Swiss-Prot record:
Keywords: DNA-binding, Nucleus, Phosphoprotein, Proto-oncogene. Residues 138-162, 188-267, 310-365 are annotated as: Disordered. It comes from Xenopus laevis. This is N-myc protein. One of its GO terms (biological process) is regulation of transcription by RNA polymerase II.
Amino acid sequence: MPGLVSRNLDLEFDSLQPCFYPDEDDFYLCDPDSAPPGEDIWKKFELLPTPPLSPSRSGLHGDPLSPGLPGDYGDSVDWASELLVLPPEADLLGGSGWGELGLSPCNVKSIIIQDCMWSGFSAREKLERAVSEKLGKASCTPEPTIPHPPSSTVGSSVSGRGVDMNNPAAHCVDPAVVFPFPFNKGESCRTAPSSANPPPCTTTTVPTSTTARNCTQPCTSSSSSGEESHSESDDDEDEEEEEEDDEEEEIDVVTVEKRRNSSNKSVTSLTITVRPKNTILVSSKTAQNEVILKRCAPVHQQHNYAAPSPYVETEEVAPPQKKLRNELPRLVKNVVPTKPKSSSPRNYDSEDSERRRNHNILERQRRNDLRSSFLTLRDHVPELIKNEKAAKVVILKKATEYVHSLHADEQKLLLEKEKLQLRQQQLLKKIEHLRTC
């Protein structure tokens, strides 16, 4: 732009002396719009500017499809820069000025709407360049258009009153929502559902929306710092209004284009599918809770130990049968084969009682045998024959002493027997000697 050529690098270098960086570092010298730390501290942390973009098609004189630059091109650029700093209450061009410039209000609104999606200083620069291109083309005579199929979009008309429905500007959201400047109060732009990939325009006029969207590299600007701050506030207001539209439509979006591409049918389907699902989930949860409570009720009654058990009557009938079985003779019980074990508690109790009864019988027999043996032992001890109340310990002691005495007597008798046998042998030898003599 012409504002960039008139800048003096020496003055820029002098303005950057109070910065925090040393003199030998020319980190910010390449940025013509860099400000000292007193104005705005955030501008010191901006990224390095990229090289300027190539000139647009409107600026090329050799392009057969684009007219040459008019003589008052600088005036139109200055007018576009002033357009950005106007207050929202100002009526731009009084309703008929757009027709004189060859632009319809919807076209300008569409430019600003589609550029409001980009935040930062690059959005203002792209917007200013797009408006200047439109103004330069509007001042020249339009060339005859080439016939095109009905599906292709038609360029913007010269008159500001009539608005074509096939214009790409009509494929946007209502401009009054995000554009703060009041144009003609009586006119309103109708909107149509936007398509994902609109067909290219076949007329000589290049759509400004494509130019603004294809500009992905930041450009330099010739406006002052006051204009930049004012455009930042306008962009913030536009972004807040777009966020309010997102909240009203209740759609989760990632980008603004995705929200505009979505149709009203998808919105209604989302709200309809979500609400009955919640009601169905609530009803199903309540039904499941009722079923669980009904199933758990008998369990609580069974585990309530304080309440009377419903099986008490059947258990009380079992003890008389046990008594009858215990009264049967012992021989009969020995003859009857044992029943197989069952899982019922009543049969288990009966088997346990029968086992205990057999054990008691065997224990009683053992005790009787032991008593009888003690009585027999007492009878064999001479000292305890007449003592019927002798204790078992006394019987055992006396019996032990009596056994020891018997062993001593046996030894004595054995020695006497040996002596007698020797005596017998001597007598026999004596008899034989007498016979031989």
